[in-house]
Amino acid sequence: MTTSAASWRSDPADPSVASARERALRQRSEGRVRITASAFGGVTRLTDLAEGGALRARLPRGGPGLEAVIVNTAGGVACGDVFSIEAKAGPGAHLTVATPAAEKVYRSDGLCADIQVRLVAEAGARLDWLPQETILFDRARLRRRYEIDLSATASFLSFEALMLGRLAHGDAMGEGHLEDHWRLRRDGALIFADALRLAGPMGALLARPAVAGGNRALATLLYVAPDAEARLEEARALLDAARCEAGASAWNGLLCVRLLAPDIETLRRDATSFLMAFRNAPLPRVWAT
């Protein structure tokens, strides 16, 4: 017998509350988006776009290269959600990927939300991955995986910011689960692997000096390009005016900047100033809305 979602919820023979796994599987959101940008005579154009589920791509006009804004029509991320994003900049193309607002990750009944991101920049391409911050609510559970494949002559810039809890609303993140896995390859060789895992009492974990020193907002910027190491002193000089804790290092053609702040407003202000100066270009317009 086939049972609809409505009858499943109201069936008196079932427990009044389904297990977390059953509930998540029935209510979860899924979304997929794939974008390819190609260069034609020095102009970057969209050459492939595939969308499915809750994810959509919008292409505002103006600015250098092609700008794609990924929209989550589900209004946030909940337990059991599965999202996949792929973006590719073909030879000589310039693609910027952003999001229209902060992404909210809501309280989970047990399952992790999964987000998979795959980014590719081919010979001479430039790819900027610039989503706005992700905010984790109390008891949120999030797992993200990033796979980046670059040509040796490509340029890649990414910025990812996290806020654990909603301090502006007086909501601390007491418990939760966060995993971030990064794998970055240049011409097929692994040059950067990073893994972050925080699980359990978030307040106690973040208070540790070796973790966040009591800060609740954290961000990582990566820049991979032929001139990455040569720009280290420039990056450090730009960070001198930062109000948050910040540091930069460079090795093997990669520049990494880490930022920590007590709140997302401080981190966002410093990050915005840094990104605008370092990129020598305005941020995506959605950052100002």
From Swiss-Prot:
A GO cellular component annotation in the UniProt record: cytoplasm
Source species, domain of life: Bacteria
InterPro entries per the record? UreD
The listed locations are:
Cytoplasm
GO MF assignments: nickel cation binding
Instruction: Reply yes or no: does the keyword Chaperone apply.
Output: yes
Q: Which UniProt keywords apply?
A: Chaperone, Cytoplasm, Nickel
The cross-references to Pfam families, in alphabetical order and at most eight, read:
UreD (PF01774)
The protein's predominant localisation is cytoplasm
Q: Which residues form a coiled coil?
A: none
Subunit relationships = UreD, UreF and UreG form a complex that acts as a GTP-hydrolysis-dependent molecular chaperone, activating the urease apoprotein by helping to assemble the nickel containing metallocenter of UreC. The UreE protein probably delivers the nickel.
Function of the protein: Required for maturation of urease via the functional incorporation of the urease nickel metallocenter.
Family to which this protein belongs: Belongs to the UreD family.
The protein, known as: Urease accessory protein UreD
- Upper taxonomic lineage: Bacteria, Pseudomonadati, Pseudomonadota, Alphaproteobacteria, Hyphomicrobiales
